[in-house]
Curated annotation (Swiss-Prot):
Name of the protein described by the UniProt record: Chromatin assembly factor 1 subunit FAS1
Disordered: annotated span: 1-39, 292-330, 434-477, 502-577, 791-815
Family designation: Belongs to the CHAF1A family.
UniProt biased composition (Basic and acidic residues): 10-21, 292-328, 806-815
Biased composition (Acidic residues): 516-532, 554-576
The organism of origin for this protein: Arabidopsis thaliana (Mouse-ear cress)
Tissues of expression: Expressed in the shoot apical meristem, young leaf primordia, root tip and first lateral root primordium at the hypocotyl/root junction.
Protein induction: Cell cycle-regulated, showing a peak in the S-phase.
One GO process term, biological-process aspect: DNA replication
Coiled coil: 244-336
Keywords tagged on the record: Chromatin regulator, Coiled coil, DNA damage, DNA repair, DNA replication, Nucleus, Transcription, Transcription regulation
Gene for this chain: FAS1
Function according to Swiss-Prot or TrEMBL: Component of the chromatin assembly factor complex (CAF-1) involved in chromatin assembly following DNA replication and DNA repair. Assembles histone octamers onto replicating DNA in vitro. Required for several aspects of development, including seedling growth and leaf hair differentiation. Plays a critical role in the organization of shoot apical meristem (SAM) and root apical meristem (RAM) during postembryonic development by facilitating stable maintenance of gene expression states. Seems not required to maintain transcriptional repression of heterochromatic genes.
CC annotations in GO: CAF-1 complex; nucleus
Length: 815
């Protein structure tokens, strides 16, 4: 565009100069019109010479040697049209010859090109332009006359390579200037060669002369083209430099991008290797975890197999026990048949004898089996009972039954035992009927019937009916009642409530008694015993009765171990001045005399005072369970620590000194040992003397160390059930600790609040834990109606969410 604008500026400047020449020529219009024939001939000959020079200059511009500049951009052509346009530009051949030549050149580069494609491309892309004297009858595509000066040009320069566009524009401008001059000269020749007799001769001649004066001559065209070529070459050089600079910048940018890509590729490679290592590490850890899980499963399977074996052994023992019981029942039936034969001799007396109730018979038989030395009395009492002839009515039997029941309840309440702890007790009251048995140890759960036998049974066996006295009637005015809720997991209460409420009355049953704690829910703390774990004393076989003594001995050992203190443990008042207490008075006197002699030297006194101060600090550290840090003690071989290149014994001593080096304790302050610290020593001595005067307390040893206190606290917080379940969970984590110690530890560090065991705040503060706030905010007091509705209404089929959450937490902890 810059070249075209420059050409236009030069043309405008030339047109601005031409009017002056025209004005000069217009001053002599008659000079051209009044030429003689000789002058015309000379003018025509000069114009012919100029025409010949223009033709030669056109051929010079269209020289083939100059067309080689166009082929420098042939490598930039990517399509068939662009290649055809570059080969066709400034060619003067007819269409057929041009197509053949272009086809041959393209055939060398691309074998797939065809003649038809080349011809269609030439026709569509290029056009044939005449820059000479145009013949109207000539064929534009096939004419080959030299006077027409034919030239093929590309319709649109955009399809040409950008490097040759400027040169093509200059050459086209030069050809146009030559064509304009040729046209003007040919018009002037035509006007001069016409006859003067024609009408428009003068006007045509003047117009041709005026047009010829406006058009640049050959010399002007040459100078104009030289200037344009120089300017174009400078511009092209500048463009080339800019292009090279851009290419250099692009190359630098490309190199930088490649370097960044290489860097990113290396980073990705490193990251990939790191991820591969992490993946391998995870796989290794997973393999280790799988192996551990496999070992756990194997141990669990072994435990399961062992448990199944134990259960099978128990089942075998139970079957053997049942068979033994069947044999014993057969023996009892045999004894009963023998008694029937014996009773047949006194039919009259047996017919008149009243039948006693079954409860009395069972009570009598239980009292018979208690002690071996009372067998004769019981047999005699049974014989007296069989021989009684008194008649008893139904009311007498009922009254007698109630009296024995009340007396038994009174005896149980006096011994702090509650009859009816369970509505369906697992133990049988009388497993077999026999007159004499081996003496056995009575269980704690069976009611002791000896006192009842001393009272009511002796009177009954002597032939007198047991009738309650007046004193017994006064005591049994308040009849015992059974308080049993329908859907409650706890056993019912059977007995007499000793006190009466002053607030809760028949007309005010829903009032709150201040003496009762309505927030405590005993059902949440109660836990049913699992089946197969608790066996009553009546179901024990002979082997278990023999092992009972061993178990009692073990229990006694455990109870004795409660008072034992582990090795290295020191309570608050123990470990203080132990050496002083162990020294005999005689030895102490001897030491005092010797110490008095040694104290004469000041150095020995200072050393003794330091030892005494060190002993006091050590006792203080042992008493307070804190470490003693000493910072200013030196050793005679401290220089060996910094020495290098040691060998032999010195090298071994250096290693030992480094291992035994006293280092700063990070959580405690340094303690300087002062020689003149007499006041502190006196205070410590007074404290130690006081501690010696007081006897040491027999504190129980802590079986669970303080390092495991955090585990105990987390277990208590995660378990929302009763203390039995908490102790069972702790037993799984600490199998070596007895349950009594675990129960004591739970009660020591926690309180039962809000229907669960909660850890004390001081324990949480000691461990650095924050007490969890109440989730439910303030808890409203429970009313007595809520208390009774919870126990009297049928339970919902959906389980409580708190119990589910607690069970899930417990399973997670066990896992």
């Amino acid at each position: 565009m810059d070249e075209v604008s420059t050409v236009n500026e030069n043309e405008n400047r030339k047109t601005m100069i031409e009017p002056k020449k025209l004005n000069k020529r217009k001053r002599e219009p008659t000079a051209i019109e009044n030429l003689t024939s000789e002058e015309k001939e000379s003018q025509i000959s000069s114009l012919n010479l100029e025409m010949k020079g223009l033709f030669d200059y056109f051929r010079e511009v269209m020289d083939k040697s100059k067309r080689t500049d166009l082929f420098s951009g042939f490598s930039e052509c990517s399509s068939l049209n662009s290649m055809v346009a570059l080969l066709m530009e400034e060619m003067s051949l007819p269409l057929s010859k041009l197509v053949d030549e272009i086809y041959l050149k393209l055939k060398e580069k691309t074998e797939s090109v065809t003649m038809v494609a080349v011809k269609s491309a030439v026709v569509s892309v290029g056009q044939r332009v005449s820059y000479g004297v145009l013949n109207v009858d000539a064929d534009v595509l096939e004419d080959d006359s030299e006077s027409c000066l034919w030239c093929w040009e590309t319709r649109d320069l955009k399809i040409m390579p950008s490097s040759v566009r400027g040169v093509l524009k200059l050459r086209r401008t030069c050809r146009k200037k030559i064509h304009e001059r040729i046209t003007a000269v040919s018009a002037m020749l035509a006007a001069l060669q016409r006859e003067e007799t024609e009408k428009l001769w003068r006007s045509d001649l003047s117009k041709a002369a005026e047009k010829l004066g406006k058009i640049l001559s050959e010399v002007d065209i040459r100078s104009f083209m030289d200037n344009m070529m120089q300017k174009n070459s400078s511009e092209m050089a500048e463009k080339d430099s800019k292009r090279e600079e851009k290419l250099l910048l692009k190359q630098l940018e490309k190199n930088r991008c490649e370097a960044e890509k290489e860097k990113k590729r290396m980073e990705r490679q490193v990251l990939k290797e790191k991820l591969q290592q992490e993946k391998e590490q995870k796989l290794l850890q997973k393999a280790i975890v799988d192996e551990n899980n496999k070992e756990k499963e194997e141990t669990e399977s072994r435990k399961r197999i062992k448990k199944q074996q134990d259960e099978s052994e128990k089942e075998q023992k139970r079957r053997e026990k049942e068979q033994a019981e069947l044999k014993k029942q057969l023996q009892v039936q045999k004894q009963a048949s023998i008694m029937e034969r014996f009773l047949k001799k006194s039919k009259d007396s047996s017919l008149t004898q009243p039948k006693l109730p079954s409860s009395e018979v069972t009570a009598q038989e239980l009292s018979c089996t208690k002690h071996e030395n009372e067998i004769g009395k019981v047999v005699q009492a049974i014989d007296n009972a069989f021989s009684t002839t008194c008649e008893a009515t139904v009311d007498d039997i009922r009254r007698e039954h109630f009296a024995s029941w009340r007396q038994l309840g009174h005896l149980l309440s006096s011994s702090k035992k509650h009859w009816g702890m369970r509505r369906q007790p697992k133990s049988e009251l009388f497993p077999k009927l026999k007159l004499s048995t081996n003496s056995g140890v009575t269980s704690d759960g069976e009611p002791n019937m000896e006192k009842q036998g001393d009272g009511c049974e002796e009177n009954n066996f002597d032939g007198r009916q047991c009738k309650p006295s007046s004193s017994n009637r006064k005591k049994s005015r308040r009849v015992k009642q059974l308080l049993q809720f329908d859907k409650s997991c706890r056993p019912g209460f059977y007995g007499i409530w000793p006190s009466q409420s002053q607030v809760v009355k028949p007309r005010r049953p829903l009032q709150k008694d201040p003496e009762l704690d309505y927030e405590v829910d005993s059902d949440e703390e109660w836990e049913e015993e699992e089946a197969g774990e608790s066996l009553s004393d009546c179901e024990k076989d002979e082997d278990e009765s023999l092992e009972e003594g061993c178990s009692k001995a073990d229990d006694e050992d455990d109870s004795e171990d409660d008072f034992m203190v582990p090795d290295g443990y020191l309570s608050e008042d123990e470990g203080v001045q132990v050496d002083r207490m162990d020294i005999d008075p005689s030895e102490q006197d001897a030491n005092t005399t010797s110490s008095k002699q040694d104290q004469e030297s000041p150095e020995f006194c200072a050393l003794l005072q330091q030892q005494k101060h060190l002993q006091n600090l050590t006792d203080h550290a042992l008493k307070k369970t804190q470490p003693l840090i000493i910072c200013n003690l030196t050793h005679e071989k401290v220089s060996l620590l910094a020495a290098k290149d040691l060998e032999g014994t010195q090298k071994v001593e250096q290693i030992c000194l480094r291992a035994l080096m006293v280092r700063q304790f990070p959580w405690s302050s340094l303690i300087e040992i002062s020689i003149n610290d007499i006041q502190d020593e006196d205070q410590e001595a007074s404290k130690f003397s006081c501690s010696q005067s007081t006897p040491p307390s027999n504190s129980k040893a802590k079986i669970i160390p303080d390092s495991d206190l955090l585990t105990v606290v987390s277990t208590i917080q995660s378990c929302s059930q009763g203390i039995n379940r908490v102790v069972e969970t702790l037993q799984q984590k600490f199998p070596d600790v007895p349950k009594t110690k675990l129960r004591q530890k739970v009660r020591e560090i926690s309180d039962f609040e809000d229907s669960r065991w909660q850890v004390k705040k001081e324990v949480l503060t000691k461990l650095g834990l924050s007490p969890s706030p109440d989730k439910g905010g303030k808890r409203l007091p429970k009313t007595i109606s809520t208390f009774f509705s919870k126990r009297c209404l049928p339970p919902s089929t959906k389980p409580q969410p708190a119990v589910e959450d607690a069970a899930e937490r417990l399973e997670n902890e066990n896992a």
